[in-house]
């Protein structure tokens, strides 16, 4: 099931847990979203390759350099993007409501399918008038196939072609 993660652990959306997450000085939140068939660990493996430290991830670098609180979204990439987007917008709304501190700004960074899930969540969040949308300052989509992935296009073409063939049933 979809959840937020921090340092590899499930993040409970309770006032106590979120009070530990945010420092008194820092209420800027960055959410990293992985791509297809990955988990939040994807962000660590690339930081390790680039910076040579196996304990390092991009969230930690963002916290150190720009003062953000970073968390990671884990979701089932086998589900449809719209279903994940709708679930993400509700989960983010729960986080904002449960936080004992006012979250002043939100940034979302999505890789590949994660960028599409982020975009879908923004759509549903706006449609449903969630309060977190007003706090959203940036969405970065890294390698997100906004116009369709080549494999998905081929799959759709083949599906339509096969449906047009009259087969005895």
What are the functions of these language-model segments?
Residues 1-73, 83, 90, 101, ...:
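Flexible, membrane-associating and regulatory peripheral segments of lipid-active enzymes
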Residues 34-37, 73, 80-169:
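Serine-dependent carboxylesterase/thioesterase catalytic core
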